[in-house]
Amino acid sequence: MIAYILKRLLLIIPTLLAIMTINFFLIQSAPGGPIEQMMAKINNTQSKETQGLVKERSYRASQGLESDLLENLKKLYGFDKPIGERYLLMLKKYLQFDFGESFYRQIKVIDLIKEKLPVSISLGFFSTLLIYLISIPLGIFKAKRNNEPLDVLSSVVIIVANAIPAFLFAVVLIVFFAGGNYWHWFPLKGLVSDNFESLSALGKIKDYLWHITLPVLCISLGGFASLTLLVKNSFLDEMGKLYVVSARAKGCSVGRIFYAHVFRNAILLVVAGFPQAFLGMFFSSSLLIEIVFSLDGLGLLGYESIVSRDYPVVFGSLYIFTLLGLVASLISDLLCVVIDPRIDFEKR
């Protein structure tokens, strides 16, 4: 097992390198950039005009600007160096987790990520936890009562819930429960109250949970369907295997067969997928929710950095996200071994 872990850790290096290389050259070749946007701001031009000028690959937006100012802008953003040199310099710094400074925020990228991280971790972790706590029992319930009226009804409910956009559900919750036209049970925005620091330890926990309730519900809404059906189908698949038939023939009770034998095999894939499910919620499901509830997290940061061509933030976030994804994949494999020691990855 140790040899397998070492092999997977070594494979992280070329995988991470390939992903960063592809994204570096794709983003560098995309139209627009920080220099063009800065010149547009200086000239008070509209963003549409700037984009049109960039498509022509000219610096007409710099008309009226002195050439030395243009050179200073290039030097400021590091574009005075060849693209190959910029790429190698980026890799060298990233090995030391030095992502540079944001072009527009005047703060180190690593500090910026640390600042936004608690919001996204909160949303991702609690949403994933809620989905698992509901979907696993519900999936087992549906497997036991396959094709019965309650199974069909619950399938309709979770499929309809899955079809509702998270941002639309967020607006509905705000209207009804966050000071819209009905009740003011939950706060409208933010992760904590203004007087958070003055609260007791228990008060801080209650305030924190009070603020994340609605965002977590919105993000979780679309995650129930796939996991619930996965749990159900996993149990149904195991129930049809020969070892279950043999156990029944030997007189084992249905409950003993289900929980002593079927459960461990069926739940293996579901539990092992928790790290990657968390990262999926963490990275991709919170952007619109962060916007609606005014939560300044990594989803909003990534979107704004891409739009503004803030390359240090884009590449720094991508590097961290990719690294976490690769580590989560390894953790998933290790969870498989913990749940079922018969699995041997060293033969792979």
Residues of each region from the PLM?
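Alpha-helical transmembrane segments of integral membrane proteins
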Residues: 2-3, 117-118, 126-127, 131-150, ...
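N-terminal signal-anchor/signal peptide hydrophobic helix marking the start
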Residues: 6-12, 16
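Residue-level signal for discrete positions within transmembrane alpha-helices
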Residues: 12, 116, 120, 156-159, ...
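Hydrophobic alpha-helical transmembrane segments of membrane transport/permease proteins
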Residues: 16-82, 181-204
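Hydrophobic alpha-helical transmembrane segments of multi-pass integral membrane proteins
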Residues: 17-21, 87, 125-129, 172-173, ...
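Juxtamembrane/transmembrane-helix interface segments of polytopic membrane transporters
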Residues: 19, 23-27, 32, 170, ...
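Membrane-water interface segments at the C-terminal ends of transmembrane alpha-helices
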Residues: 23-29, 157-189, 218-224
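An internal, D/E-rich "acidic patch" concept
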Residues: 69, 74-136
